[in-house]
Amino acid sequence: MNSIIRPRRLRRTEAIREMVRENHLTASDFIYPLFIHEKDFKEEISAMPGTYRWDINGLIKEVTRAWELGIRCVVLFPKIDDSLKTEDGAECFNEDGLIPKAIRILKKEIPEMAIMTDVALDPYSCDGHDGIVDETGKILNDETIEILKKQALTQARAGADFIGPSDMMDGRVGAIRNALDSEGFSDVGIISYTAKYSSAYYGPFRTALDSAPRENSKKIIPDNKSTYQMDPANSKEALIESALDQYEGADILMVKPGISYLDIVYRLSTFSNKPIAAYNVSGEYSMVKSAAMKNWINEKDIVLETLLSFKRAGAKLILTYHACDASQWLQDT
């Protein structure tokens, strides 16, 4: 055979493969999601092996470890006691609440670490939805946004670097941007959950926060979030959401979930000039961890390949529960 073009020439040795490698992973690509609670001990999440609800002291140690591994941003999610949950989720803008308190402590102890927060009502709602639910089961868009603005401002006052609206209410990015700017927080960024799909991959996360929709004898509660989260069948809709969020002032656009939506990551990366983030969500994490615990797969190889696929699809940032493990593996390689 006399073939002039032989792609295998560039695969011949590890050195050559490294020379022509198109995408690379680094610890600074990762945003590390952390669950926190008011208890004075860490508590493993049964549906997410190796992941915990952290107490404040444990949180400081874990964030310090992440910084030392090269991770430069964490995102905080609260497990709120049922006694504090209400229909309007008002605890979300309590200046002395769990999230503002955690932000202030982290900024004192590890000031260099960037902190992202979550803006949505579901952890704080007795109904388990991201917005206010009326008697007919409708999720109230504009009324919810008024609460979200208060939540975002509370987080910014505590020292958050990035606000992460995950609620999927129409117009919330612009409303939050205007609220932040009007209070002097023009330097606080917005990482918008731009294409957040109504996905079955969120199950373990909702277990971690006890944030799934709940039955209520006094009114209708939808058992899913499909009236505000996106239909998994749609891709063009993601471009509409992207254009809106970018116009309204989002700094970074996110796709959630990640693995099953790499086409959306790619489309947004070519459609928008904003950095794209992908969320390697709880269901994806738990599937890998469960299979690895049974020795059905090589956890390290699967995780690094999965994370690399996000970069290859066009993501600049990856939210992943594997962040510390992956960072350590990259150091050891």
Would you name each region that the model predicts?
Residues M1-R21:
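N-terminal amphipathic/basic leader segments beginning at the initiator methionine
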